[in-house]
Design a protein with these regions (language model features):
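Short, flexible segments with low predicted structural confidence
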Residues: 2-3, 35-36, 52
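Active-site-flanking beta-strand signature of metal-NTP-handling nucleotidyl enzymes
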Residues: 3-10
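Short, surface-exposed ligand-recognition loops at beta-strand->loop->(often short) alpha-helix junctions
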Residues: 10-22
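An amphipathic, aromatic/His-enriched active-site/gating alpha helix that lines ligand/cofactor pockets
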Residues: 24-39, 57-92
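Short, solvent-exposed loop/turn elements at beta->coil junctions and helix N-caps
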Residues: 41-44
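Short acidic/glycine-enriched loop/turn segments that link adjacent beta-strands
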Residues: 46-50
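Short, low-order "capping/linker" segments at domain edges
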Residues: 92-100
Length: 100
C-alpha cells in the first residue's frame, strides 16, 4: 500500500531566497535520492496554518521506515531547519488529490 508523508513548516522571515534555493537544489533532489517521490506542495496565503505543506509518496511502509531512520533524512531535515520553523510531518495512506 502506497503511503504519503505530509510535511509542513513556516519559512523564517528574511530567509526566503536562501530557503527556495535550498529546497530546489538540495531538499527535493535529496528526498528523491532516498526514494520519496514528491507529489504536491501548497503555500498558505491566509489563515493560521503552516505556510508550506508538501507531500511525497513511497510504495510501502518498509521503504518509508528505512528512509525516516536514515542518517540522510536526519541530515536533510536538520539542514531544512536553518530556513524554517515548526517543521513536522505525518504519514498517511496515499490517495489522489489534496490531503491533510
Amino acid at each position: 500500500m502506497a503511503l504519503k508523508i505530509l510535511m509542513s513548516w513556516d519559512i523564517l522571515p528574511g530567509r526566503e531566497q536562501e530557503y527556495f534555493e535550498f529546497v530546489v537544489r538540495e531538499f527535493i533532489p535529496g528526498i528523491q535520492r532516498m526514494g520519496l517521490e514528491p507529489t504536491d506542495a501548497w503555500f498558505t496565503m491566509y489563515g493560521n496554518h503552516p505556510q508550506i505543506i508538501a507531500g511525497a509518496e513511497v510504495p510501502n511502509k518498509q521503504t518509508l521506515d528505512t528512509i525516516l531512520q536514515s542518517s540522510e533524512w536526519l541530515a536533510l531535515t536538520e539542514r531544512l531547519l536553518n530556513f524554517v520553523t515548526d517543521f513536522s510531518y505525518k504519514v498517511i495512506t496515499a490517495r489522489k488529490g489534496f490531503q491533510m
